[in-house]
Amino acid sequence: MVRGAFGRLGRLVRHRLFQVLVSLAIGAALLWLAIARIDLAGLGAELAQVKPSWLVAAVALYWVALMLRSWRWRILLAPVRALSFGQVFHGLLVGYAANYLLPARLGELVRADLLGRRYAISRLSIVGTIVVERLFDVVVFIGFIFAGLAALHSTGDSRIGPILHLVELVAIGCVVLIVLLLVLIRLRHKPLPRPIAFLEKRLRALAAGLHLITGAQEVALLIAATAIVWTADTVTYWLLAYSLNAPLTLLQLFLVMGMSCLAALIPAAPGNIGALQYALVLAFQLLGLPGVTGFSLATLAQGCCIAGSTLVGGGLYLLAALGNARTRPKLAEPPVP
């Protein structure tokens, strides 16, 4: 039995190590491709001209956007369990830190597990709220890409085709997911066929997290919350670009946001290093702007915004882990003879 447990642990470690190595390789390859597309000598000069006041404003708004995301997630969690803003914000920061540090966006499961353990909530119900949250985000991402492509002077660029094909695949996946969620909601109070009856409890727990997409009023509330969240995110990127003396028009900004979202779908290195650089270099070059500015924008976003929230989220997780270790009951010591 012990040997079997160690065998399973070994396979899990190897699997996780393989995921990390693959993500690092993808990030390194994309970073190399991004560097190959720009004048690397001009990168230092580009970053040296950053306007500090605009950069500070961008970082401040980035944290406001994170708070707004916590507010939206709290709305989604309300039918499952009423939590304070601080409790939700803590979970979101830890989850986002894990997303930036771990491959395959495992941070979504980390925040579900954290809130589930801490507040005795079904993890599947929390996962259901995260699925809804990300579904609304994907719809925004698709809108960004299609609106942003309208900013291009030439639609005959051969680089546009692969982007559109990828967005189409994401859109198809989004539609399939919506259909599956609607089916799950309809079946949540009905007994399942005997072969899959063992899943009934789990599926109902998952469906509990989908409660807010069952009514028009609730969907309208989520649309409004998502619009506010993404407005803050979009203005953050505009401020970062402006700090680099690169004021973007609205349609140009939409393409940049869409490409940054596309980069987030790639299981690349921690902090999305490489993927974000390549995506924004490509976006700026499609817009007829210097690719080095896109590279600088990605680097600023990672170094000044993402790194800060990752450090805070990681610190909160470590503090919680240390607190749990201290409060864990100790085993009784045997009496001294």
What are these regions (language model features)?
Residues 1-93, 151, 155-265, 293, ...:
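Predominantly cytoplasmic-facing regulatory/coupling regions of multi-pass membrane proteins
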Residues 86-90, 108-110, 121-134, 289-300:
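Membrane-interface alpha-helices at helix entry/exit sites of multi-pass transporters
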Residues 95-103, 257-277:
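Transmembrane alpha-helix interface/packing and boundary motifs in multi-pass membrane proteins
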Residues 245-251, 273, 279-299:
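Extracellular/periplasmic helix-loop-helix junctions in multi-pass membrane proteins
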Residues 109-114, 127-130, 140, 225, ...:
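Hydrophobic alpha-helical membrane segments of integral membrane proteins
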